[in-house]
A protein has these predicted regions:
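Globular "head" domains of long coiled-coil molecular machines
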Residues: 1-222
Length: 225
């Protein structure tokens, strides 16, 4: 979406989820619960604090808000983007670190309401048994899923790793496409208007998946309902 909202890193980088939806202009707010855990989703029991959108990362990152000491529910950013205009909302969650982590539990609780899951890892290594265990459980809750391997510009061997990961997914009976992407190549392509570099970044393939297999399917199901 061409907006550096969510922190990235090689370890668990964020401690709070970030919701990204459509808006007339870029804006952001922090959402706190004023009630019990059971009342957390009630808008009447929430406090919303506007912040500059460029500061979202400060409040959701593990380094400045370790294990969510600030007790945020989530950060909510709004952007004027065509991808989001049809109602698509993206949610960036903290790294799951296996089924037994608190982050995994929080992600699992949100999956039944999600239209799709993007499982993101970098292109340096094949999936661990903990990650495959997480995916096996996650796809029971949200069958519309895809895998995304990032930083492919840093790992010349990423395609071999991708094939190994496709094999792991198939062996586990997980039917989901896998995409390789590079945000750095995407940024360079946008800056130079280089169509070939944009294609190499892999981002367009992921956007097409979101438009067709997520937004398109959701609209079709809504029309049938």
């Amino acid at each position: 979406i061409n907006a550096p909202l969510c922190p990235v890193g090689t370890d668990i980088t964020t401690s709070v989820a970030t919701m990204v939806s459509a808006g007339d202009a870029p804006s952001a707010e922090l959402v706190y619960s004023l009630g019990t855990p059971e009342e957390a989703e009630d808008p009447q029991r929430q406090r919303r604090v506007p912040i500059p959108i460029e500061r979202v990362g400060e409040f959701v990152c593990q380094a400045r808000n370790p294990d969510n000491e600030a007790r945020l529910l989530y950060a909510h950013a709004r952007l004027p983007r065509s991808l989001l205009a049809d109602g698509l909302t993206l949610v960036d969650t903290p790294g799951v670190g296996g089924l037994n982590s608190a982050h995994a539990a929080a992600t699992m609780s949100a999956l039944p309401q999600a239209d799709a899951l993007l499982f993101v890892s970098d292109g340096s290594a094949e999936y661990s048994s903990a990650e495959l265990e997480f995916l096996t459980t996650a796809l029971r809750l949200c069958p519309n899923a895809a895998a995304v391997m990032t930083k492919i510009d840093l790992y010349p061997d990423w395609e071999r790793i991708a094939e190994i990961n496709r094999g792991h997914l198939a062996a586990a009976g997980l039917a989901m496409p896998l995409f390789g992407v590079s945000s750095r190549l995407r940024e360079a392509a946008v800056a130079t208007r280089d169509a070939q570099l944009n294609a190499e970044s892999g981002i367009e393939a992921v956007l097409a998946h979101l438009r067709v297999d997520v937004v398109g399917n959701a609209q079709l199901l809504g029309a049938r309902a």
